[in-house]
């Protein structure tokens, strides 16, 4: 990564602009909503978007409106492709082996938020959609 932006900060738009003075070449999109719109508006010519999720709208009663900055994707000739994890089911074993190796080598740092107890599942799910966890959200159930 060249830079990061705290999407929960009040000044995330300023952070995004400062972090991308020359625009954005690649977006690994998992959130959607306002941040995706702001990123789309800053995409460079021949940029690429890997659309892997849109979690900001998963709990909405009505689908969110389309991005207002969608026209920039056309003008900049951006390539947008959706990716679903099940498309790579045949490679899960390979992925687990490689990722485990990288974690063991310290090349990938794994952070977790652990919630204790089966009865806390509803709270944990709400935490997930509210972005209140760091890293993976794990519910530990005593056996």
Language-model region placement:
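Terminal helix/beta-alpha structural elements that buttress the NAD(P)+-binding lobe
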Residues: 1-143
């Amino acid at each position: 990564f060249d830079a990061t932006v705290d999407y929960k900060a009040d000044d995330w738009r300023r952070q995004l602009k400062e972090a991308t003075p020359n625009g954005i070449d690649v977006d690994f999109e998992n959130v959607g909503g306002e941040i995706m719109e702001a990123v789309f508006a800053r995409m460079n010519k021949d940029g690429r978007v890997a659309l892997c999720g849109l979690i900001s709208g998963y709990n909405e009663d009505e689908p969110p409106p389309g991005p207002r900055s969608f026209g920039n994707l056309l003008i900049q000739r951006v390539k947008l492709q959706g990716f679903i994890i099940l498309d790579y089911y045949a490679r899960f074993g390979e992925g687990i082996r490689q990722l485990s190796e990288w974690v063991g080598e310290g090349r990938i740092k794994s952070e977790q938020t652990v919630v204790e107890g089966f009865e806390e599942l509803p709270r944990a799910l709400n935490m997930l959609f509210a972005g209140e966890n760091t890293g993976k959200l794990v519910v530990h159930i005593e056996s």
